[in-house]
């Protein structure tokens, strides 16, 4: 089946699909104060989704393209679940978030198919993949249209990988007690086996969101990157997120001696947001297998255990948490009780001495991850490093932080 035919098959014009903002039915919804963070964007008035401009631009989306798609959504007069929220248009039609971003992606997909130059075609495929992935954002369980967009994002990513520098291998890893999981191994030019970073992404992201991280930071240093979807989404959708949050990554880590392209004696883990929960767990549970663990804006204790901090978090992010935990009908109180069990401090890990070198970067006044969170991680390590990242200029400081973190990882892997 061609890519175009797949698009037509998946997105048949139907209007009965459940609208994204209604998938999680928490009972205590309320208005929240304005909030902004470097890694998550901000909760803009009249939008259900957080608008994550920094990360979308970092992944290669032109700011004007973001505004163009937003404008089409705003201008739609189609029926909405909530008339006060622009991105709640019901059904796959003009004005619907998934429709408009997927339509934008299809334009780039068409350009990719028509482009003769392999490298340029690869760039267009990668861009299409990014846009399909934004269409599927925030990847809530049971969102049929989003899952279809995600399938197209993965397909476009595979097409891009065939044309871009280095090589990418799609790998399947067995996990006892359930379905195998699919990971992507990104390898730089040269002969392996390569030192490798195991990427642990955030709960509202997919494994294909981190190509920029590989291309700009890891590949130039000769480091490979292995990505894996978090439990309950993407290729790991058959696995529920549990208090043993590192389960899937742990099984992949244990299997690396059998992967000929990976130097299993030189492996580090890198965690964004809740991915740091996974990475830090691995630092404790699999210390002999890891040379280092780096975290950025970690979610390992404060947000999971502090009701006051949870009350400042946007509705969409709480919905993401509830969706990942399989608590689609839960009250905020029930969600808080469950989240507390995911705190690595409550689990008795953080605070104990850890032999694995750990770095953690934070932004001051980050609503998701206070300075104390990163400090708790680095002081628990026998070789800890704390990085404060100034907020403005946000893009330049984000780049500087990633360069510093990559240098630190590279030093530990050499």
From Swiss-Prot:
Entry EC number(s): 3.1.1.1
> For this UniProt entry, which segments traverse the membrane?
none
Which Gene Ontology terms cover its molecular function? carboxylesterase activity
Q: Which reaction does it catalyse?
A: a carboxylic ester + H2O = an alcohol + a carboxylate + H(+)
Keyword annotations of the record: Hydrolase, Serine esterase
User: Superkingdom, according to UniProt?
Assistant: Bacteria
What family is reported?
Belongs to the FrsA family.
What does it do? Catalyzes the hydrolysis of esters.
NCBIfam families for the chain: PRK05077.1
Protein name in the entry: Esterase FrsA
Q: Which organism is it from?
A: Salmonella typhi
Q: What is the lineage of its organism?
A: Bacteria, Pseudomonadati, Pseudomonadota, Gammaproteobacteria, Enterobacterales
